[in-house]
From Swiss-Prot:
Keywords: Membrane, Transmembrane, Transmembrane helix. The lineage of its organism: Archaea, Methanobacteriati, Methanobacteriota, Methanomada group, Methanococci. InterPro entries: Roadblock/LAMTOR2_dom (IPR004942). Its main location: membrane. This is Uncharacterized protein MJ0163. One of its GO terms (cellular component) is membrane. The keyword Transmembrane helix applies. The chain crosses the membrane at residues 3-23. It is found in: Membrane.
Amino acid sequence: MDAIIIFLILFIVGVLIGVGVYYYKEKERKKTYKIIEMEIIENLKELKPYVAPDEGREYTKEFDLVEIALSYDIEDIIVVNDEGLVIATTLKDADEVGATASSIFEYIKKLCGNIKKVVIFKEDSYLYIYPLKLYGENLYVIIESKIALDVIEEKEILKRITGVLKKYFSTITTIEQEIPEEALLSI
């Protein structure tokens, strides 16, 4: 009987030590990933001044769209709603550009009817305006690039931007689900 009790005690101690070692290694692994992530962010912060537009504009501190812009050699990405209000952007002050581009798209749409995109060549860059419908919202993606984008790149960029926007909109739908409907009606 004593042997069984000693065995059970040693077994439980062994399992607890094993679980403790496992959690310690997981904690260290997460800490390592966090350190690597912070180094990447710091490197992006160092890189941003070298690729930022020359017009005195600065990139924002959010790196989801900046990563897309850097990977495709794009200067700016601005996402606005149908009223011209900025949803997401790579620039700090993109309100004026977003509102102007969305109004240009709407004006051309009234003139020409059903259009898929608008491409404007200005001085040394291209301005692409794409309509996008996401979760019932009419959005416009405005891309400014010094190089012309081909159709395949456009689709890849829009797909990645849509993925980023889904993250933004998923948090909004989560918040709406957490708030009771009566509270929304009283507001």
